[in-house]
Each structure stands twice: as C-alpha cells, then as structure tokens.
C-alpha cells in the first residue's frame, strides 16, 4: 500500500506546483485533488478548469513524480445527487462529469461521489431513488471513461451499514461503480474492519482518518466523540490493514485530515501524516 494526501489538508494559499513539491518531499506517494467552488483554494480544480490548466497540472505531476490518485469534490453536498429539485441533480451531474474529465486528463484511477442524504422533509426512499437515477444517467459516461466512481460513506445519514452500500453499488451494476470507503467515518457507531470484510472487492479507493469514541460502554459505540489525528483514535489499524489485504486492496491510503496545531508548520504536519500512514501500513 502507498501513502496519499487529499489536497484539502494543504494550506489553501499554496499553488499546484509548490503543493506537489512539498508533498513529494515530505514522503507522500500520491495526491488526491478536489473539484471545488471557484476561490476555495489556490490548488482547487473547478467547473471552469481548462484543458490547458489540466495539461499544466499533469506536467507538474510527472515532473515531481507524484501521481494524482483520485478526484474528490466539495460540491455534491450531502444530498445533491438525490435532491428533489432537478436543477440540483443537473448540477450534480455537471460536477461528476468534471471529475471524470479531470481524472482522465490527470491519469487518476477514480473519483469520489456522495449520493443520498436526507434533509428535513425528504424521505429515505425518495433520496435513494433520485440518487440512483442520477447515477444511472451517468453510467454510460462512467463506463466510457473507464474511471472507478466510488460512492463514499459520509456523515449524511444515507449509508448506515455496509449492506446499504452493497445494495446501492450492486443495483448500479457496473464494474466502474464501486465503493470509496472512508475508514474513520463509521467508527462512532460501528466496527470499520467488518465494513471492509462486507464490501470486499467493491472497494476501489480508501480514505483514512481516525476517530476517538466518547465512552466505553458497548465498546464505545454511539457514545459521541470526535475526529483526531491518525493513530490517536479508536480505529483498530491492526485489523483494518489485514482486512484490506484480505479483500485484495493494495492501493493508496489517502489521508483526509486537517492541521489543528497552529504552532506546527504545514510541512511538519505533512511529514507527521506521512509517518503515521507508514506506521499504519507496517504495523499490521
């Protein structure tokens, strides 16, 4: 397995070339870029990113020997794919098409998408129906691009068990519609290693973060808590890595983490995260 970092972790004032150089020098093997609103950061992809800009980023990636692993986004919200408003769903499709275009141009093997979500006054049934409709409308383009399109388990109340994800992925029925599994996002209420076992070969990409449960009764499940630095929470890494290996995953562990210590420089933080991922990989 290899070490990657999501670009949201990086100082927002850092441009593409400096970011790629810094992450390569601090020990990473890859980077995940993001499609964001214009102005989000100096290293965001946007709906307006041109072919020339993508060519330049590709050149930087090749020069620094730091590959683009995947393309995430902040623009799908928690529910846009399943929104009752058709305009919202059309925007979701535009975002996903942009992710596919960027992934293809930059050599990334996958993108991350967020289906569902259940805001007030919208049912689970409708959210799922509309999310699936949005995905199936894009299925021909996903398969033509040959880009793994991973649905992620986020905190939007949609995927509350691995079987929810399995049902959704299997209904889409495509070798390119898979799971982008976030190891830390289920720790508050479940056991992450067993999600990996259940999802199996559906997993295409992995996010890593850590979570500290708020109590100890019933194993600490449903006791609150908070996200913490890697290796400082309750993720059972000694079980997670063997579980990933057992389902055939040997890709990048992409950290989606944020610097909380204002006294620490960004480069020192990147080194700390890279070292933590290396420990996670080698300790199991």
Predicted regions, residues:
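Acidic/histidine-rich catalytic cores of soluble enzymes
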Residues: 2, 31, 37, 71, ...
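Flexible loop residues that form catalytic
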Residues: 36, 76, 116, 182, ...
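A short, acidic, flexible beta-alpha connecting loop/helix-capping segment that sits on the rim
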Residues: 10, 254-269
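N-terminal pre-domain/capping segments
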Residues: 1-104, 136, 174, 201, ...
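Short acidic/polar active-site loop segments enriched in Thr and Asp
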Residues: 29, 67, 109, 204, ...
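A short, acidic, amphipathic alpha-helical segment used as a generic capping/interface helix at domain edges
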Residues: 233-246
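Active-site clefts of carbohydrate-active enzymes
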Residues: 216, 224-228, 250-261
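Active-site acidic/histidine proton-transfer and metal-coordination neighborhood
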Residues: 18, 62-64, 77-178, 238, ...
């Amino acid at each position: 397995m290899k070490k990657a970092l999501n670009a949201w972790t990086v100082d927002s004032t850092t441009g593409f070339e400096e970011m790629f150089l810094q992450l390569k020098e601090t020990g990473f093997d890859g980077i995940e870029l993001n499609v964001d609103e214009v102005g989000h950061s100096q290293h965001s992809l946007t709906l307006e990113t041109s072919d020339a800009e993508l060519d330049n980023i590709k050149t930087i990636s090749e020069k620094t020997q730091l590959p683009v692993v995947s393309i995430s986004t902040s623009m799908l919200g928690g529910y846009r794919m399943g929104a009752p408003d058709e305009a919202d769903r059309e925007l979701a499709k535009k975002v996903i098409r942009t992710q596919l275009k960027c992934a293809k141009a930059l050599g990334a093997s996958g993108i991350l998408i967020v289906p569902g979500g259940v805001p007030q006054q919208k049912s689970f049934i409708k959210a799922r129906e509309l999310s699936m409709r949005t995905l199936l409308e894009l299925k021909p383009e996903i398969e033509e691009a040959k880009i793994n399109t991973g649905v992620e388990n986020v905190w939007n109340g949609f995927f509350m068990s691995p079987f929810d994800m399995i049902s959704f992925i299997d209904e889409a029925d495509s070798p390119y519609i898979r799971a982008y599994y976030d190891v830390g996002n289920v720790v508050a209420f479940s056991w992450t290693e067993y999600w990996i076992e259940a999802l199996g070969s559906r997993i295409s990409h992995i996010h890593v973060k850590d979570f500290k449960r708020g109590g100890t009764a019933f194993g600490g499940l449903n006791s609150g808590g908070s996200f913490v630095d890697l290796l400082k929470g309750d993720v059972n890494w000694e079980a997670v890595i063997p579980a990933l290996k057992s389902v055939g995953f040997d890709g990048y562990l992409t950290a989606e983490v944020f610097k909380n210590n204002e006294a620490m420089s960004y480069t020192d933080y990147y080194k700390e995260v890279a070292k933590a991922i290396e420990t996670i990989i080698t300790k199991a």
